[in-house]
């Protein structure tokens, strides 16, 4: 029971961290698209491409989980999402809409891991606690809605001084959140 509780805790942490990161990123993505693109018709494209990335991430998750395990697939998919955040960060540095789109696609992989983590928590739980584990996972995702935009607003001036773009903070929070999510899956779910 202790091992299952530890695994569920790790999965819940991964949901919380990745939600904070992902919500921080999508908070600034439309504004970032406006910053790097001159055409207002393109503003919604990065978030739409991110949904496609979530689809591709789910496919990647499925293939890796068949070959290794669900938990290894989750950890790797979160890590790929963190790489997407790095690409998004760089897209603002070099002022590239194409890189913004590629980064949004790759970050979508991390979002797919967030969604998969919710269900993985219920798979790990015993029959008696499956519903509780799933409910807690959904509640942990609420942290992203609350703290993601808050972190962006608190640190935007600091990163504006460093990188000449206050929007970069959303991608830094996303990278850290996805890396912490990957680490929490690795740390708490290995026996």
Per-region residue spans from a language model:
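C-terminal ends and interior cores of transmembrane alpha-helices
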Residues: 79-94
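Hydrophobic core of transmembrane alpha-helices in multi-pass small-molecule transporters
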Residues: 16, 97-114
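C-terminal membrane-cytosol helix-exit motif in multi-pass small-molecule transporters
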Residues: 148, 152-153, 157, 175-191
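Intracellular juxtamembrane helix-capping segments at the cytosolic ends
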Residues: 29-31, 111-126
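Helix-to-loop junctions at the C-terminal end of transmembrane segments
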Residues: 57-70, 156
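Helix-loop boundary and gating motifs at the non-cytosolic
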Residues: 1-53
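Glycine-rich segments within core transmembrane alpha-helices of 12-TM secondary carriers
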Residues: 53, 132-152
């Amino acid at each position: 029971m202790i091992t299952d509780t530890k695994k569920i805790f790790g999965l819940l942490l991964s949901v919380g961290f990745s939600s904070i990161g992902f919500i921080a990123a999508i908070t600034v993505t439309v504004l970032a698209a406006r910053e790097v693109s001159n055409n207002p018709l393109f503003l919604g494209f990065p978030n739409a491409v991110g949904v496609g990335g979530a689809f591709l991430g789910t496919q990647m998750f499925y293939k890796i989980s068949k070959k290794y395990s669900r938990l290894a697939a989750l950890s790797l998919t979160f890590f790929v999402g963190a790489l997407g955040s790095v690409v998004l960060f760089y897209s603002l540095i070099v002022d590239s809409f194409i890189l913004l789109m590629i980064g949004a696609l790759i970050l979508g992989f991390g979002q797919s891991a967030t969604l998969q983590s919710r269900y993985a928590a219920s798979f790990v739980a015993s029959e008696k606690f499956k519903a509780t584990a799933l409910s807690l996972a959904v509640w942990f995702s609420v942290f992203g809605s609350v703290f993601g935009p808050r972190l962006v607003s608190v640190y935007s001036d600091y990163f504006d001084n460093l990188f000449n773009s206050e929007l970069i903070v959303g991608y830094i929070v996303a990278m850290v959140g996805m890396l912490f999510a990957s680490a929490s899956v690795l740390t708490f779910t290995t026996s």
